[in-house]
Amino acid sequence: MSPLIDSLFPDQAGRQSRLYVGIVFKALKILIIVLNCSLPSSTTSYSLKNGSAINSHSPIPTMPLITLEEHYVSPAVRDANPATRDLYELFPPHILSKLESLGDERIQDLDKGNVSLQVISHGPGDGSPSACSAANDGLAAAISKNQTRLAGFAILPMNEPSTAAKELERCVKSHGFVGALVDNHLDGKFYDDERFWPVFEKAEELDVAIYIHPTFASEEMMGHYKGNYDDSVAMALSAFGWAWHTETGLHILRLFASGLFDRFPKLKIVIGHMGELLPFQLDRILAQSERWGKRDRGLREVWRNNIWITTSGMFTLPPLACLLQTTSIDHVLYSVDYPFSANEKGLAFIREIEKSGLIAGEDLEKFSYRNAEALLRVKAKAS
């Protein structure tokens, strides 16, 4: 029996494991259909110039593009945990190939979307200290072969926060990583618990960003999403269909309420997916947060100074407009969510933004690459 499926559907342990695999695979197929390789309409023509996919109805871009929420999977992490291995075995072969590639296939896909620099991070999954170190060393080796195109976020063993802080320091100082990407929770435990704070303390000390990324529901969380519908729907609601975003948004509020940002006022936190639903509710949350007890700084100031937001996996104008009305353009960054979304789809979104005028001129440069350069201290070259 799959440990992953047991955790997702513990009250159905008597069913055959192949049924569980079918349920999760069906849900993952929905995710792939929605997010991955949903390329621009066939009415938009493309031509190739210098190996890059170009929309022939728009000017050829001269500015660089940097993406920040772009994934890979290391065998060191995947194969060390049966649940993680089971999860990744459910993905279609072409997605697995892209997740496992840190070489030619990845670079070719960057060219297709005019991506100048991709910041790579591990996909969801817990890792032991040794597995995380091995994964980080492997990523560093791959980056060394394409230093102008690739950068790295570390994977950290969050179950051992002191060790995780040391691994973050090692990766930044020895490998030149630009921060870390961590799962949104550890089996349902959020990082407002002070036992996790050594990681944030170290990130502030090193002046690097922590990217908080959605992950799959714990067994306890999963029960909240089951109902009078198929288990594949429950799976989707607990993950990419809803809870990935609400739970990550909730996490940011928990971190604020716990006093984390008062303890570490220079901390840099990144979240994706247009702000994990927070921008839509921000005014209401700001008003309510004034009743949450005395803070050195209010939520508005924390939002303005400590939170950066990427557009990963989101390619429509209405949520971007909402984000821009609540957040300084200096803290809004382009991303794709590769390989679950295609770089070409991101490029088409850049075209749509240009055409709409929603972001233009110097602000478009900030969104596309300058903000990432400033936050991560990297440099990108135009395609």
What are these regions (language model features)?
Residues 116-251:
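Active-site gating/metal-coordination segments in enzymes
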Residues 72, 124, 156-158, 186, ...:
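Active-site-proximal loop/turn and secondary-structure-junction residues that shape catalytic pockets
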Residues 62, 71-100, 218-246, 285-306:
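Active-site gating loops and adjacent loop-to-helix segments of metal-dependent hydrolytic enzymes
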Residues 77-78, 130, 221-229, 275-290, ...:
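Histidine/acidic-residue-rich catalytic or RNA/ligand-binding cores of hydrolases
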Residues 66-68, 118-120, 151-154, 180-182, ...:
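Hydrophobic faces of well-ordered beta-strands that scaffold small-molecule active sites
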Residues 256-259, 265-302:
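Aromatic-lined glycan-binding groove of carbohydrate-active enzymes
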Residues 4, 8, 51, 57-117, ...:
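Mid-to-C-terminal alpha-helical segments outside catalytic/metal-binding sites
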